[in-house]
């Protein structure tokens, strides 16, 4: 049994430092690197790719809305043509750095409000997926487990890593509980690890109302921008390995 651990990294910008990339990188297997539109800049992108190479961590692009002030967490209405080309542009930017460092670009995971918008907007999802296929049909698309965009990507011939979230509560329909609602974010590391093991080994987890929901867990997102990020990432990895689950980059088992 195999699973990937991913985290959103490279989200500093200019003089502003965000996240604990160097520490979190010790425990994950795939890094989603910001591509300059919601966070990140050329220097940060190259530094993050180099760090991933040094740590043996696979690299993926983490494109978002062009919204530095809002950190890509504010919805923007895009035409399909805009969405397709925005994604292609951002993937290409990160690919320049992975190529310069002798690395392959493993995956693409949309960021923040864009990620959430894809779940609700099939036309937008198709446009984003087309932007990915324009770049390389062999690349892995990381998307919310069981969601319609994941299905569309598979229908369009892309490899998909179904993603679950370590520290987030789920609605009965498999979507994430909005951050502002009570109980949306889980902070207890033992509970987080228990839920992660359930998702990987049992194929599901209890929703916020106690109802069991089925989830395919190819990759687990651990957030790298909170004070307990390193502690939680280390604990999750240790518990998974103690359970006999191999923690490896998604590219090793997503075919």
UniProtKB/Swiss-Prot annotation:
The annotated subunit structure for this chain is: Forms a complex composed of PxpA, PxpB and PxpC.
CDD domains per UniProt: LamB_YcsF_like
Q: Which GO terms describe its biological process?
A: carbohydrate metabolic process
- Report which reactions are catalysed by this protein: 5-oxo-L-proline + ATP + 2 H2O = L-glutamate + ADP + phosphate + H(+)
Gene3D superfamilies per UniProt: Glycoside hydrolase/deacetylase (3.20.20.370)
* Bilayer-spanning residue ranges: none
Q: Please name the GO terms that the record assigns under molecular function.
A: 5-oxoprolinase (ATP-hydrolyzing) activity; ATP binding
- Recorded family membership: Belongs to the LamB/PxpA family.
The job of this chain, per UniProt, is described as: Catalyzes the cleavage of 5-oxoproline to form L-glutamate coupled to the hydrolysis of ATP to ADP and inorganic phosphate.
User: Do you know which Pfam families this protein is assigned to?
Assistant: LamB_YcsF
Organism of origin is: Thermococcus onnurineus (strain NA1)
Which InterPro entries does UniProt cross-reference here? Glyco_hydro/deAcase_b/a-brl, LamB/YcsF/PxpA-like
Underlying gene? pxpA
- The source's domain of life comes to Archaea
- Enzyme Commission identifier(s): 3.5.2.9
- Top-tier EC class: hydrolase
What keywords are annotated for this sequence in UniProt?
Answer: ATP-binding, Hydrolase, Nucleotide-binding
> What's the protein name?
5-oxoprolinase subunit A
